[in-house]
Curated annotation (Swiss-Prot):
Domain of life: Eukaryota
Subunit relationships: Homooligomer. Can also form heterooligomers with other sarcoplasmic/endoplasmic reticulum calcium ATPase (SERCA) regulators ARLN, PLN, SLN and STRIT1/DWORF. Monomer. Interacts as a monomer with ATP2A2/SERCA2; the interaction results in inhibition of ATP2A2 Ca(2+) affinity.
Record field: transmembrane: 25-45
Main subcellular location: endoplasmic reticulum
Gene: ERLN
Subcellular location: Endoplasmic reticulum membrane
Function field: Inhibits the activity of the calcium ATPases ATP2A2/SERCA2 and ATP2A3/SERCA3 by decreasing their apparent affinity for Ca(2+).
Name recorded for this polypeptide: Endoregulin
Membrane topology: Single-pass membrane protein
Keyword Endoplasmic reticulum found: yes
Keywords: Endoplasmic reticulum, Membrane, Transmembrane, Transmembrane helix
GO cellular-component term (any): endoplasmic reticulum membrane
Keyword Iron: no
Length: 62
């Protein structure tokens, strides 16, 4: 059991010492963050434009 834990620790340490793995992880995190921010902006501006359109239509009918 101790050997299995020891091998897993070695692999984990080797991963963090490889700059290509760190860079790849950073790119994946940035991509996911950008997609989430775009979705957030789409929701926020979609709600803002929908309320403005309903107010304009109500004003035109009067």
């Amino acid at each position: 059991m101790d050997q299995l834990v020891f091998k897993e620790t070695i692999w984990n340490d080797a991963f963090w010492q490889n700059p290509w793995d760190q860079g790849g992880l950073a790119v994946i995190i940035l991509f996911i963050t950008a997609v989430l921010l775009l979705i957030l902006f789409a929701i926020v501006f979609g709600l803002l434009t929908s309320t403005e359109n309903t107010q304009c239509e109500a004003g035109e009918e009067e």
